[in-house]
Amino acid sequence: MTGTSIRALAVATLLAGLTAGSVRAEEATINIDNFAFTPAETTVKAGTKVRFVNHDDIPHTIVLANGKVRSKALDTDDSFAFVFDKPGEFVYFCGLHPHMKGEVKVTP
């Protein structure tokens, strides 16, 4: 391999790594513990995956108040993820325990 080929390969490898890193989506986690979502209010950028993780000993669900998302019942240590791809304020609650509420604010 010539010096030019090695340099071209090195540049291509570097650019491939940068591209892969920039494509990676953001992720946020909301924990469910003691019949509460923590944090109860979360602000993320559009395109962020939000993962809800149940740490309680009983099942919980995630339901968006607009009715567009409803998870299955999450047992202990189960999780549910959803990508918030549009800006707005999204109120959610547990369908099994409606007093459990939270909000995800999505910025552009």
Enumerate the language-model features and the residues they cover.
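Extracytoplasmic copper-binding redox domains, predominantly the cupredoxin/blue-copper superfamily
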Residues: T2-I6, G17, G21-P108
